[in-house]
Each structure stands twice: as structure tokens, then as C-alpha cells.
């Protein structure tokens, strides 16, 4: 439930020790948080909340928070550090050490963020707030199970500050 999420869960001094753990990648519903929902022709919120595009459900929207601590060395701080999310349904905010880094929506496309400027030597806190529905959920309504969470791999890439990138 969005209303029950602590506003400051991503802050450095917020204590997350009492939180449940969940595997990443996985879906909340498969792990017992919420109910899996199959949808074919009807939007999952039809009859439960009266909304029109481009707005996302609010009353029935769910959210989940993830926290991960990583250690960064002095040598790594002298490089470019990227974090990659290969799949998150349906949208999310990324925080590093209490600062918002960015936002992404598109469940099935990868998202990459440069977190270099947010890191410190030693322990770093990464926070991710994932929402079950967003305005892009109107476009993702297909014949499939609607599940939420970080359902594909997440990884760090550490590169030299000057490097070659392939693009098309």
C-alpha cells in the first residue's frame, strides 16, 4: 500500500533492519505480497477505480521498497559507476545515499543510471521504490499475468571515465 510506505526509507540513517527480505529478481505476488492478476481484454483496475488515460490508479495502487547496501572502493570512485535495471514493473524511483537519482517506466525495457556522483568511499545505500501501476500501464495491458517488482537482473557496471559506447 502506497500510504504505508515510509517517506524516508531511502535516507542513509533510516533503519531497514526489520524489513522482510525478497529475492531479486522476483515478483511480489509470487513471494506472497499481493495477488497475481491475469488480464486479457479488460484493464486490471476496471470496475475498481474510475480513471481515464493518462492517469494511473491511486486507490488500488501498490508499492514496494527495496534497499541494498554496496561497498565502493576509492579506485571505483575514480571511474564511472552505472546501475542497470533489466526489468521493473511498472515504474520506479531510484535513490542513492538519500538522494533521488532518477525515475523510469517501461516494465520490459532496461533502465540505466549513472550513480557516480552519488557514491562515497565505503558503504552506500541504494533505495528503489516500485509502483505496481503507472500511466504507462495503459500501454502494457496485454494477455498476460500482471506481476510487480524487480523481475529481471540488476547490476553495476564500472567503466573508465573515458570509454567507447556502441550506439545505433
Task: Give the residues covered by each predicted segment.
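Predominantly extracellular/luminal regions of secreted and cell-surface proteins
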Residues: 1-2, 8-37
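Accessory beta-strand-rich segments of carbohydrate-active enzymes
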Residues: 1, 5, 27, 35, ...
Amino acid at each position: 500500500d502506497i500510504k504505508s510506505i515510509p517517506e524516508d526509507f531511502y535516507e542513509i540513517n533510516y533503519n531497514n533492519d526489520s524489513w522482510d527480505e525478497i529475492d531479486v529478481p522476483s515478483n511480489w505476488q509470487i513471494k506472497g505480497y499481493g495477488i497475481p492478476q491475469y488480464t486479457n481484454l479488460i484493464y486490471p483496475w476496471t470496475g475498481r477505480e474510475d480513471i481515464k488515460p493518462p492517469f494511473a490508479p491511486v486507490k488500488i495502487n501498490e508499492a514496494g521498497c527495496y534497499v541494498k547496501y554496496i561497498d565502493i572502493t576509492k579506485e571505483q570512485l575514480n571511474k564511472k559507476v552505472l546501475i542497470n535495471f533489466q526489468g521493473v514493473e511498472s515504474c520506479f524511483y531510484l535513490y542513492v545515499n538519500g538522494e533521488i537519482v532518477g525515475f523510469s517506466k517501461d516494465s520490459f525495457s532496461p533502465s540505466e543510471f549513472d550513480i557516480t556522483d552519488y557514491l562515497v568511499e565505503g558503504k552506500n545505500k541504494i533505495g528503489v521504490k516500485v509502483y505496481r501501476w503507472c500511466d504507462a500501464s495503459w500501454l502494457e495491458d496485454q494477455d498476460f499475468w500482471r506481476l510487480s517488482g524487480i523481475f529481471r537482473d540488476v547490476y553495476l557496471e564500472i567503466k573508465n571515465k573515458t570509454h567507447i559506447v556502441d550506439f545505433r
